[in-house]
């Protein structure tokens, strides 16, 4: 079924304005990674608040091309942006943690520090400007829990949280975003050479097809269900015991 992207854009922009007003906030900001999800969200917040929207680029031992792409997106949208380099804070924290750890730290435990430092940075600016933080998670990532708890999952609003990754690509084309950004291999930038699909072992297209139709290989179905089970804790507020 053909999607009416003009209608969806208007609905999302109005929703962003409404939620921002409800929070008595002044505007919106987003972390710009150089990827398609953040590019789409940046477009939406710019449309919602042309003068009170901000992109924040936060390299952290990242691929330099990602920062270039993030700047390109901001310039393409005429979106105000700032760059906060997190190399030194990350290095200092990792050094302290390694010194206190009696064994070799888990790779993912160290990698997840990056999105958590970015979350802290976003909320620093949000508090200073009275803005809300717009997250970049899409439906596919949310369904399988492919995000860092209290990292990229730590946001106020998820404007594309009801769109699969495949739909985000289609939306990006409708919005006229640079083709380089749309065709770029999705990556969380957790370590050098990391890609989402390489880490998962499945393509977003196949995962989306299963999420929308219930059809997929036995291996894919097992992967999705396993990820959903493992990530339930990410989607809940902290539990409180009944006394």
Curated annotation (Swiss-Prot):
Stored SUPFAM superfamilies: Adenine nucleotide alpha hydrolases-like
PANTHER family: GLUTAMINE-DEPENDENT NAD(+) SYNTHETASE, NH 3 /GLUTAMINE-DEPENDENT NAD + SYNTHETASE
Molecular functions per Gene Ontology: ATP binding; glutaminase activity; metal ion binding; NAD+ synthase (glutamine-hydrolyzing) activity; NAD+ synthase activity
Alphabetized UniProt keyword annotations: ATP-binding, Ligase, Magnesium, Metal-binding, NAD, Nucleotide-binding
Name of the gene this protein is made from: nadE
Uppermost EC category: ligase
Entry's Gene Ontology BP terms: NAD biosynthetic process
Gene source species: Carboxydothermus hydrogenoformans (strain ATCC BAA-161 / DSM 6008 / Z-2901)
Protein name: NH(3)-dependent NAD(+) synthetase
